């Protein structure tokens, strides 16, 4: 793409000149400033917020990343790094006065070390690809966001991603050992260590979840875990959200640590069942999915205890997965919930906050009241075990006033910042 493909007049910078300068650093084919070619980069998964990129740069090496960042730093040009664009908090939304740096070519799995139980990968490697590469050695990478088939490990580090199994196995910060990054001044930095308990300040915890504000991740070393010998999912359906909330607290208080403990409300249940036919009871007001893993006897005992608890606490249907296929089908419904909601609403606004487990029912009840107040549907799909909520506020951007009501319905995110709420006060270069 040539530097003069399209005049840039949206702001005060001469973007044709900047694109030409960047083409001296990166292959001209991968410095994009044509409007139609840059349009796919105007937003991430939170499509309600968009900004057309001035220039998109797709480097092929760490040296090129360093040179691009040095160039931008010297000219105070903001840089927004993009992984797969699956995020739901506008973290990859372009800055109106900056460029987009896409890590799409950093896709090499550099090393799988089964003896040390680590994987060393470039930042553009897909989350699920790490587990796929480790599977022949009986190992897996634990954090599993719903978008794991597409999201990248660099984006996971930026967002400190979790997933349905984070209750037992932790978030990205608990599973990353070392990160190679480039600062906004173009300097290479290594944070962390392959050792499980490295010396010095824990800068890795500072970096993980910093959403690109501290540098551009180019390489990540993660720890791998042995695949559990056995795993079963207990699916429990309730006719009342309060009962389901009480069940969550009771499971944890019994000393049971599930691999995953997820909850869905009726709107999410119906949408997911219609989408993937997981066998969910669509008449349920709330659905719990509780996975137990470990050795065969331990899993059998825990699954029986959880099943008995669910009946005791008022579930009207309880099923325990009997095969690996059935277990995966139960989870497929949960992990497909977000795209399933997309089939019943033109747009949705995903929020992300954490509350005490004991207040789940109270918060869900308040959401239903707000749903009536703002005349917008809300679907709830969330990590019940640690109280991490993901309410999806459904709206149609083509209907005047609905997006504004959705914004008023929502709130500032607590586990991930909203890029459009911070761009005005944070310097990226």
Predicted segments with their positions:
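C-terminal substrate-recognition/cap domain of FAD-linked oxidoreductases
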Residues: 32-42, 222-226, 232-409
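N-terminal flexible segment immediately upstream of the FAD-binding catalytic core
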Residues: 1-70, 87-117, 146, 266-277, ...
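Hydrophobic alpha-helical segments, chiefly the membrane-spanning helices
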Residues: 426-429
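Glycine-rich active-site/cofactor-binding loop and its immediate structural neighborhood
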Residues: 76-78, 89
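FAD-binding subdomain of flavoenzyme oxidoreductases
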Residues: 108-264
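Conserved small/polar residues in nucleotide/adenosyl-binding loops
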Residues: 415-422
């Amino acid at each position: 793409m040539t530097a003069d493909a399209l005049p840039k007049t949206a702001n005060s910078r001469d973007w044709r000149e900047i694109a030409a300068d960047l083409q001296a650093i990166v292959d001209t084919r991968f410095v994009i400033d044509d409007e139609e070619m840059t349009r796919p980069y105007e937003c991430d998964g939170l499509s309600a917020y968009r900004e057309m990129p001035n220039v998109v740069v797709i480097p092929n090496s760490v040296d090129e990343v360093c040179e691009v960042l040095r160039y931008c730093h010297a000219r105070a040009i903001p840089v927004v790094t993009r992984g797969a664009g699956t995020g739901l908090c506008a973290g990859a939304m372009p800055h109106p006065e900056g460029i987009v740096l896409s890590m799409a070519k950093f896709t090499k799995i550099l090393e799988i070390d089964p003896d040390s139980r680590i994987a060393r990968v470039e930042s553009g490697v897909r989350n699920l690809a790490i587990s796929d590469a480790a599977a022949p050695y009986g190992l897996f990478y634990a954090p599993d966001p719903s978008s794991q088939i597409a999201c990248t490990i660099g984006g996971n580090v930026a967002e400190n991603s979790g997933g349905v199994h984070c209750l037992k196995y932790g978030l990205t910060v608990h599973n990353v050992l070392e990160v190679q990054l480039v600062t906004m001044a173009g300097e290479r930095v290594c944070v962390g260590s392959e050792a499980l308990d490295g010396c010095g300040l824990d800068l890795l915890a500072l970096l993980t979840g910093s959403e690109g504000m501290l540098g551009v991740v180019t390489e990540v070393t993660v720890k791998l875990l042995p695949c559990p010998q056995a795993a079963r999912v207990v699916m429990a359906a309730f006719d009342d959200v309060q009962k389901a909330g009480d069940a969550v607290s009771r499971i944890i208080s019994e000393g049971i640590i599930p691999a995953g403990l997820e909850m869905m409300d009726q709107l999410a249940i119906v949408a997911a069942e219609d989408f993937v036919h997981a066998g969910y009871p669509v008449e349920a007001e709330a659905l719990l999915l509780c996975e137990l893993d470990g050795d065969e006897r331990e899993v059998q005992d825990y699954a029986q205890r959880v099943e008995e608890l669910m009946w005791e606490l008022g579930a009207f249907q309880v099923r325990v997965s009997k095969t690996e296929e059935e277990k995966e089908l139960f989870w497929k419904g949960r992990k497909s919930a977000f795209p399933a909601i997309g089939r019943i609403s033109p747009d949705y606004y995903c929020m992300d906050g954490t509350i005490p487990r004991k207040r789940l029912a109270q918060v869900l009840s308040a959401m239903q009241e707000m749903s009536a107040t703002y005349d917008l549907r809300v679907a709830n799909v969330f990590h019940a075990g640690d109280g991490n909520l993901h309410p999806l506020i459904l709206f149609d951007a083509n209907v005047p006033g609905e997006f504004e009501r959705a914004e008023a319905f929502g709130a500032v995110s607590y586990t991930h910042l909203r890029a459009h709420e911070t761009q005005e006060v944070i310097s990226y270069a």
